[in-house]
């Protein structure tokens, strides 16, 4: 019984023509994730500090967030994206550097929103670090 010959190499992604989208920047204490989606929320490109080869505590640096944002921005520009709204969420150190990196790639930024969830006295926070 012969199997159908299928190639194992990945298919080339089809180029979408999307002019505007939303960049979701999730900056945690340990990592920074950037997802660029269209207006409906379908992901077009993504990147993170860990995906760029940073490991451990170097993932949480502003430079790692900048490299990740540049990578996600380049991938999104390949699909024809030119204008971005930016949604920043989380308390991490890579928030501003990711924003500046997306500007440097050449996007026209129309809006910046901070969607960090703020508790109205919800769960008890972690204990204060003493170094």
Swiss-Prot record:
Q: Does the keyword Ribosomal protein apply?
A: yes
Under InterPro entries, the record lists: Ribosomal_uS11, Ribosomal_uS11_bac-type, Ribosomal_uS11_CS, Ribosomal_uS11_sf
What keyword terms does UniProt attach to this protein? Ribonucleoprotein, Ribosomal protein, RNA-binding, rRNA-binding
Q: What Gene Ontology molecular function terms does this protein carry?
A: rRNA binding; structural constituent of ribosome
Question: What are the recorded Gene Ontology BP terms?
Answer: translation
Task: Please provide, in alphabetical order, the Gene Ontology terms of the cellular component aspect for this entry.
Answer: ribonucleoprotein complex; ribosome
Question: In its keyword annotation, does this UniProt entry include Heme?
Answer: no
Q: Please name the NCBIfam families in this protein's record.
A: PRK05309.1, uS11_bact
Q: What does the subunit comment say?
A: Part of the 30S ribosomal subunit. Interacts with proteins S7 and S18. Binds to IF-3.
Role played: Located on the platform of the 30S subunit, it bridges several disparate RNA helices of the 16S rRNA. Forms part of the Shine-Dalgarno cleft in the 70S ribosome.
User: What is the similarity comment for this entry?
Assistant: Belongs to the universal ribosomal protein uS11 family.
Name of the protein in its database record: Small ribosomal subunit protein uS11
Lineage summary: Bacteria, Pseudomonadati, Pseudomonadota, Alphaproteobacteria, Acetobacterales
Q: Which gene encodes it?
A: rpsK
């Amino acid at each position: 019984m012969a199997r159908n010959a299928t190639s194992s190499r990945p298919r080339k992604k089809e180029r979408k023509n999307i002019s505007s989208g939303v960049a979701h920047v999730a900056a945690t204490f340990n990592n920074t994730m950037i997802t660029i989606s269209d207006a409906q929320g379908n992901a077009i490109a993504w990147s993170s500090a860990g995906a760029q080869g940073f490991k451990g505590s170097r993932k949480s640096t502003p430079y790692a967030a900048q490299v990740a944002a540049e990578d996600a921005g380049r991938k999104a520009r390949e699909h024809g994206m030119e204008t971005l709204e930016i949604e920043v969420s989380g308390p991490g150190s890579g928030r501003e550097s990711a924003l500046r990196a997306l500007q440097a790639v050449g996007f026209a930024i129309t809006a910046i929103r901070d969607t960090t969830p703020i508790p109205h006295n919800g769960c008890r926070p972690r204990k204060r670090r003493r170094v």
